[in-house]
Amino acid sequence: MSASTSRPAISSPQKEPASTAARFSSARRVAHAGVENLQLISRFSKKGTAQNSAFGVEYKFYDDECHAQVGVRLGNAENVWVRRLTSYHIDVAVSVSGGVRWATVQDVNCLEPVSGTGGERRYSFTNSGGTLVLNQRNYARFTRHGFIVMGNVMGPNVFLADRTDYQFDANEPHLRWSTGGLYDNVKGRIYVQNRWNNGTAHGWSGANYTLYNNEGKFIISQSPLAANYLFGQSDAADRLPFVMAEVDPGNVPNYKACEYSVGRKMTPQSLYLQQLRDRLGPEAVAA
């Protein structure tokens, strides 16, 4: 916004015939508030059990769904946080929904969820509408999509130093066309690909995504319209074939992403922290 004219100022003007600009106000959002230092434990029925296998591991688990599904949900808020929280037997530890920006979720554990393992279950840390959301140093166990961005979510959004164990599926941009995501020093499976007719016909799931110095099995491709990047994946042998290519052989377009230093970590150790240091100095990183 130009200080002299109070009108929007665009640094790189572009002609977009279908675009409009509108004044935006966040006056009614919750701001400068947080949830911290909590342990959330949900009761559940132990009458139902189920078995499933994923990536060569057999699991037996409780299958009750008549209990708490979400630990903390953020919506219509800015400059907010969730930290030092542990949830037990709950599908989603933290859900970020629409109208959220400048949010931090850190040092949160999502443990031993109780539910089925089909669609829309065990999305431990999910972003379905937040922008400028930082997830850092979080942990999920017995998860499906541990660290996930849903469809049409506009970034930038960051997952930093997060970890998943005993996954039924992958950390990933999910559904259709979320943009501007960074997975940085994450330990766990990460898939960025054309999901084709998977789920509810997801198609291209992520655009302008970057994977940086991660560890674990991975898939990465890009659409013809937006680049995705991979830097410093720990082991080239962790690359997997595109999942949906096996469903409809030869008909699922997945174009090679921009890849650098596959099999060898890169310097700096963290892309996000280096950019933070460059912008705000070492004090911001130490904080």
Where are these regions (language model features)?
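Catalytic P-loop NTP-binding/switch module of NTPases
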Residues: R7, Q14-A31
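Right-handed parallel beta-helix
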Residues: A31-S42, E78-H89, V100-S115, G129-H145, ...
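Short beta-strand-centered aromatic/proline hotspots
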Residues: M1-R7
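Acidic/polar low-complexity surface segments
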Residues: S12-E16, E36-A68, L111-S124, R195-A201
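Catalytic domains of carbohydrate-active enzymes that cleave complex glycans
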Residues: L160-D162, T179, D184-A287
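Glycine-rich beta-solenoid repeat tracts in large extracellular/virion proteins
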Residues: R23-R28, K47-Q51, V70-N76, V92-G99, ...
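A structural detector for beta-sheet-dominated domains
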Residues: R7-A9, I41-R43, G75, S97
